[in-house]
Amino acid sequence: MAKDIKFSEEARRAMLRGVDALADAVKVTLGPKGRNVVLEKKFGSPLITNDGVTIAKEIELEDAFENMGAKLVAEVASKTNDVAGDGTTTATVLAQAMIREGLKNVTAGANPVGVRKGMEQAVTVAIENLKEISKPIEGKESIAQVAAISAADEEVGSLIAEAMERVGNDGVITIEESKGFTTELEVVEGMQFDRGYASPYMVTDSDKMEAVLDNPYILITDKKITNIQEILPVLEQVVQQGKPLLLIAEDVEGEALATLVVNKLRGTFNAVAVKAPGFGDRRKAMLEDISVLTGGEVITEDLGLDLKSTEIGQLGRASKVVVTKENTTIVEGAGDTEKIAARVNQIRAQVEETTSEFDREKLQERLAKLAGGVAVIKVGAATETELKERKLRIEDALNSTRAAVEEGIVSGGGTALVNVYNKVAAVEAEGDAQTGINIVLRALEEPIRQIAHNAGLEGSVIVERLKNEKIGVGFNAATGEWVNMIEKGIVDPTKVTRSALQNAASVAAMLLTTEAVVADKPEENAGGAGMPDMGGMGGMGGMM
């Protein structure tokens, strides 16, 4: 296919048009008085949202060169979302400001490579200073403030804070759609996995159709059990203790299952059999997790262990186990605290190393199950459109809160970026590198300008006053007052602000050093091509 090539100024101008088209659509959502954007959906009702990355992903421009510019800025939003989970609109606004200012200077004759060097220098200083003014997040109240600012909803803030308090910072918090109008929190304590009882005859509560075992022994194996003789020795030891048994195996069937059911019905012995969770290597890892949590051993031939010679000391313990048709929950496993902590650290290291998003998700689930539990925020709303918009906001708020716990918080509302302005301005460089520093300085003002603009105010006036205020004092666009931002709970996670600035500068520097852009030439529509002559088809009647 033939290619269309544009060079230097012409190429950069075309890409800038694309950058502006996308950024102008995204930046109207910034701040407490930001507006919404309506996105057309091929099927179903339109999506109304103020989430920067969702809007950025939807934008496709007809002109190939403009579209490339738009996609580069969409990449800034997407990368910031991946790293910090929020701050996508701020990142887009910063990128647009840097690209615009940068192109003005490059057009005027500045060397793009020198400009890039200055920008990198300025961003490094800005990030160091952001870390210096960052404050660690402490207590449920601070967590609630971060979440409330991100979701623009205090109720959501307190829900997320409660969820994090209940399941810990490593706990899994999932967001689901509810059928009701209200948003609620549901917490599953202990380790839960998605396998239920092997037979409904094993239930102890026939109303709820669940089996509840108090202080049970837990036998964990990766073998399939069909013959009761294999587990008879250990069963007899458990019966002597007068305790119930949870049997986790690859499968329990045939004579073994029948014997367990008959003994349960006769009241001789209470045992519940469940299949092991997961598949393949993940199953082995999950069985190992259960064994660490309960203080037992995995009876597997890989370790030279045999079911027939299993002793009661090799079984795990827990204060309670609840088994339903679909799930098994182990509460308060009797495992060694140090071993559990070591296992948690091992899984954390695997999370850091893995490149697969799916593997990372599964590892984080395992981490949460060992570390404390799972919380589910069930989002409710009056209409489907409102539900989708609310769900996106809560996801952002949750990501934002996690980022705050990780790296601390800074003053919100664009204040922190202006707070580091003077330190960046003090950096001295020569020639085009100084131009690069000036570009970053101008960009640092842009988020607060846009927040003020969206609130119907003049951004320049707000910026100039903010530069002369004490660090931490900022403009609350929601009320129009000058306040101590952290005291009022108007905060941003340091990680979000840092990621937005780094990613914006990275893409802006790349675009400024672009000298040629190559795109596919649009195909000419062959106007009257139609179908080839099919006159010979007339003779097909003879085929009948």
From Swiss-Prot:
GO terms for cellular component: cytoplasm. It is found in: Cytoplasm. One of its GO terms (biological process) is protein refolding. It catalyses: ATP + H2O + a folded polypeptide = ADP + phosphate + an unfolded polypeptide. GO terms for molecular function: ATP binding; ATP-dependent protein folding chaperone; isomerase activity; unfolded protein binding. InterPro entries: Chaperonin_Cpn60_CS, Cpn60/GroEL, Cpn60/GroEL/TCP-1, GroEL-like_apical_dom_sf, GROEL-like_equatorial_sf, TCP-1-like_intermed_sf. Its EC number is 5.6.1.7. Keywords: ATP-binding, Chaperone, Cytoplasm, Isomerase, Nucleotide-binding. Belongs to the chaperonin (HSP60) family. Forms a cylinder of 14 subunits composed of two heptameric rings stacked back-to-back. Interacts with the co-chaperonin GroES. This is Chaperonin GroEL. It comes from Bacillus velezensis (strain DSM 23117 / BGSC 10A6 / LMG 26770 / FZB42) (Bacillus amyloliquefaciens subsp. plantarum).
